Amino acid sequence: PKTVRRQRQMCIRDSLNSIHFGSPSNKKTKSLLRGVVQGIGGYGNCIGVPTIAGQTSFDESYNGNILVNAMTLGLVKKDKIFYSKAAGLNKPVIYVGSKTGRDGIHGASMASAKFDDKIEEKKPTVQVGDPFTEKLLLEACLELMRDDSIIAIQDMGAAGLTSSSVEMASKGKLGIELHLDKVPCREENMSPYEIMLSESQERMLIVLENGKEKKAKEIFDKWNLDFSVIGKTTNSKNIELYFEKNKVANIPIDLLSEEAPEYDRKWKKSKLPQKIKFTKKDFKNLKITDVLKKILASPNVCSKEWIWEQYDHTVMGDTIQKPGGDAGVVRVHGSEKAIAATVDSSASYCYAHPLSGGKQIVCETWRNLICVGAEPIAITNCLNFGNPEKPENMGEFVECVEGLNEASKYLNFPVVSGNVSFYNETKDKGIKPTPTIGGVGLIKNYKDMITMDLKETGNIILVVGKTEGHLDQSIFAKEVLNEKKGPPPEILSLIHI
């Protein structure tokens, strides 16, 4: 008999993360690092999704704002893809998953807010996750997806019910009517405002075909999850909100989506820094063994095994290249194919010259996939920047995006998704520009996978490409010579784009 996994139309395969912390000497870094690693490991391990790759970096610019970027990779049959575009009139709008609480209210705005000494007061805006409920919700949704019940489905992420309902209606050029007193709540006396903006985790919004409510409810009841018909689609092109029979809001959908105001920020073009003129005197008193030890001891170079060993990277039994290599690799169950995935970023390159830095990250992602024998397919991104109201920060954003665009076009490496996080600053001091790139590649036969470990004595070692001796922005320059200035290395193939 076939296994349950093979019967599924889709499944979550793997997760990756890119986490950035302040200087190791900062008093909060150790506890923040431990907490983040425990959170990623605890949630991922409980839900049964392997964490196959990631990166960890340290820089004083993150002393006030750490970054936790996560990427999840799924597998789906191409003719069984579900979308978030609502369609049809008077279709039932269904709330499923956990109950709504006050946790996470204003969480999205906090993620793009400047921090000050009162940051501890924002703890109530942090969502409380429950991996066991998430696992139940995942299984229930997959079960419902086995027939033709679902018209549209979307998770309640940033801004909760507000974003999911507005986005689904906007994509379908429809209106939506919601009765908020029908939303399952775990706290008493929640206002319509709180219900709409709550970011409580483990919740989904579904538009169903008429007549499918009973069957769908039976599925979610079986998994011990909340199920409630909270509204319907309309032709009003408005979002209409009711609470205890009173209309509390009636807003045109387009004003919240396609016709929302767009900022035209002023931005400042960056200048390529001058190369540092290193001389023989800089290296005269250096011993190669001491240099090597210092580089290997750097927090940004040393082994991160103690971190990723806390993650379950083999659950599901398909991981064939664990963390620590150029990319994680998992086989596609029931076939000879394998999927490679990696996450990369380089804040120092982007800070030195955003345009060049943006190109560098895309190329590094490409190289990492190639190095495990994969054919690069596509990338996603998480663009982390400071205050866009400052022309220099907005300039970093503009030029990094231009660099990402140029490199992805040159490599035929399409960007298929992504998000942006602004206002990452504390006490008016922002982070270095940190675009994080996630890349996916395909290995047609997993037996052709390549690993980075040396195989046997006598193997030939080759250097591919021209070595220019570029030291600016290198770990050597920073850790040994204490020199942090200079431009990032050029990408020769992209110079004339």
Role assignments for model-derived ranges:
Residues 20-200, 429-436, 442-443:
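Hydrophobic, small-residue-rich alpha-helical packing segments that form membrane-like cores
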Residues 1-8, 12, 495-496:
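Single conserved hydrophobic/aromatic residue that forms the stacking wall/gate
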Residues 86, 92-93, 98-138, 144, ...:
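Intein/HINT protein-splicing elements and their conserved insertion hotspots or analogous self-processing inserts
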Residues 198-209:
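Short cationic amphipathic helices and targeting signals
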Residues 13-66, 118-120, 355-425:
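A glycine-rich phosphate/pyrophosphate-binding beta-strand-loop-alpha-helix module
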Residues 13, 47-55, 148-156, 177-180, ...:
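Flexible, glycine/charged-enriched surface loops at secondary-structure junctions
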Residues 18, 53-62, 156-165, 182-188, ...:
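A glycine-rich phosphate-binding loop feature that marks nucleotide/adenosyl-phosphate handling sites
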